[in-house]
Amino acid sequence: KDEQAESHSLKTILSFCHALFSGLAEDVKQWLVEVHQFRIEAVAGSPGLPTPEGMHRDGVDYVLVLLIKRQNIASGTTMIGSLDGSLSSSFTLIEAFDAALVDDARVYHGVTAVEPLIADLPAYRDVLVVTFRKA
């Protein structure tokens, strides 16, 4: 049994996403949902690069990027871009549970590399990414 998959926190996050995204796409009867954990690590002289790198679309309908923890990092700025390639918005997820909700068909999104603030301490950015795609 996978404790994370059965956790109250994850079930709450998925319920929130389901209610929100189903409200935006009332014709959808069933979703394909994926959950991914990402850690971007950085060390002095070697910035932590996001995955995937650069502005992109995930090929799904909706995306939640939920910050779990930032430790000793600078940057990690979330960017939202229009389909024409122009930057529409940028912001930094700072506190645990800060989030970006993305309509993947309408915008590109990405995040900048992270760098350690203090060279000899661990430096990382942990996010939970949840994607919803029409079944």
Where are these regions (language model features)?
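Intrinsically disordered, low-complexity boundary segments flanking structured domains
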Residues: 17-26, 65-68, 97-98, 114-117
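Catalytic core of non-heme Fe(II) oxygenases with the double-stranded beta-helix
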Residues: 25-95
